[in-house]
Amino acid sequence: MMPLGMVEIGESGVIGKITGQDEVRQHLAELGFVMGERVTVVRKMGGNLSGAVKDSRVALSQSMAMRVLVN
């Protein structure tokens, strides 16, 4: 597994694990980042990234993106 923040633009992966405290994991789940869901990196800008998950685009900070591990 690798952190979502390391995935190249246009590439995707399936979420295998989300690290961090319960509040962080809950927040990411509310945004659609749940285990088994496919996420695609759409854009990177200034350390942040935009990801496509569950038919939505979501912007994440680099620190949050590093908590989402994909296969």
Descriptions of predicted regions:
Residues 1-71:
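Compact, glycine-rich, soluble single-domain proteins
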